Amino acid sequence: FQAEDGIRDQPRSRGLGDVYKRQTVEGAENIPAGACVWAPNHRSYIDTPLQSCIPRRLRFMGKDSMWENWFFGWLFTTIGCFPVSRGSADRAALVTALGVLENGNDPVVAFPEGERKDGPRIFPLFDGAAYLAAKTQVPIVPVGIGGTAKAMPRGSKLLYPKRIHVIIGKPMPPPPLNEKGRLSRNDVRATTETLREEIQVLFDQAQVVCGDPNVYEPGSEPDSRVPEE
C-alpha cells in the first residue's frame, strides 16, 4: 500500500491489491484477532475484491448475481465468497456465515446496505450484520470505503485510476443475549442504527482522503424505517 502521514503501510494479500495499486488502508490496528462481522459501505463491484487487501483472511457474503460474470465469479470464490440470494431468506448462506464465526478464526464480510447504493448517504441498514454478531457474540467492525464509485462506477466493466481509501473503525460490541440466550429485536435494531452512524462517519472521512468529499442534498436525511426485503 501507499504510505502516507497517518496511514499505515500494510502488506498486500493476493487479490485486487496485486493489480490495483492506488488504495490505502487506515485503522488496521482496529482489526480484532479472532472472528468478527466486517461491515463496509457498498458503492461499487470492486468493494468485495478490494477487501482482500486487508491483512486477514476474510470470508464474504455476496449477492448471487455477482457470480453471473465469469471473472468476478472466479475471483469472489477464490477470495472466500459464498453467494446469498438477496430478497429471500437464504438459510444455507446464513448457516455458512454462522459456522465461520462460531469457528472463531475468520471475519465474515456482510455489506449491511444489502446491495450497491449510490450517493453520499448511508440509509437504514438491514439487520443481518447485527444478527450474525448477536448469535455468535462476536464484535462488528464498521468500515468506510471511499473512492470506489469513481474507480469503477455503476455499469462500468473497467477500473479507472482513481484514489481508493479504506478506513477500519473500532469494533462495536454485539447486541446482548438475555439469560435464555435469546435476542431482543429492539437491541438488534439499535445496534444496526449505531452501525449505520459509524459507517457514515468513516465513509465521509474516506471520501475526504480521496479528494471527493460527500455533499448532502437538502432533505436527503435518512429516516428510521427498516429497508424492505
Annotate each predicted stretch with a short phrase:
Residues V19, V25, W38, F60-M61, ...:
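Generic preference for hydrophobic
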Residues A92-E229:
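Non-catalytic C-terminal accessory region of glycerolipid acyltransferases
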Residues R22-T24, A89-L94:
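Glycine-rich, highly charged phosphate/nucleotide-binding loops
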Residues R14-R22, N69-I79, L158-R163:
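Alpha-helical membrane-targeting segments
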Residues R14-A33, V201:
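Short, Lys/Arg-rich amphipathic segments at extreme N-termini
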Residues N30-A89, T96:
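Catalytic core of membrane glycerolipid acyltransferases/transacylases, capturing the structured
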Residues F1-Y20:
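Single conserved hydrophobic/aromatic residue that forms the stacking wall/gate
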Residues F1-A3, K21-V25, T148-K150:
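Short gly/ser/thr-rich secondary-structure transition/capping motifs
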